[in-house]
Amino acid sequence: SEVNCLTYKEILVLGKNSPALRPTMYDFLVYRSIDILNTISRYNKQEPITNKQLLFAPVKEFVQMPIEVKKMDAYSNTLKLYQSLLQSEIAAERTDAILISDLDRLEYANNIIGLSQNDSLYIQSLEQLSQQYSKNPYKVEILYKLAQYYYQGNYISSNRDPQKALDICNNGIRQFPKYFRIDVLKQLAKEITQTTVSYSINPNVYPGHKQEVNLSFKNLSEISISLYKITESTLEYLNLNKRVPKLEKISTHTYRLPKRLDSQDTILRLPVPNTGRYQLTVSYANNSKADSSYFSSSRLSTIA
């Protein structure tokens, strides 16, 4: 298990971080086996996990716990592999490799149990590790898992907290700016703060009624929606190809929105005065090009 992975670099596909995070050939083989078991688990019913709390025990307790390996049971076999891997890393005193493998073990345990009441065990384990490695640059790996958890949340419980995730990222970036994988926190922080906008409109609106813009947005404080009437004849319009149609501006509405890091939904309504073909244009800060959609207004719009 002590054979350095670089000994086989000619036949392995090595990532930039492989020598640091997977330092021996044994590490590579264990993780390859875990990948195979994960594939098997998708196609075979797995035995339920009974001793859930021990799965989140500190690493020195986890490596001592008895794990009954069952034939064709991916869960027990994977946990046993993590246990064997951690035992070898503890024996070799590879502190950094122990942390990485332990983080993977905790995430795996949380995933296979998959119940919201176990989230506290997972978070508690990560926070304990964060304290243990408080001065070690590898703490960034722990912070990344914590930030991911709070950013992505759990579909069962309401534990999603993008602001907390962002704070964790920023604290890690300030504390360990030169860590070789600090970009994982920078990239996640960028994703959390990124402005996202999507919308849909009705293809037909009755004249005198309002077009409803179903808007989903994140990290956005203001949006402008402009309405234009296409003034060309039907024949001219159909033969436009890629040419921009002749437009008559009808209105522009600017809406103030609650700027938050989590996604929100709302409906914005614009009056449509007369029959005709319309272009609706959406613009907001930092959007390099306004987005346009088209719809029609006719007295037949409400007929199914």
Regions found by a protein language model. Give the residues of each.
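N-terminal, cleavable Sec-dependent signal peptides of secreted/periplasmic/extracellular proteins
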Residues: 1-304
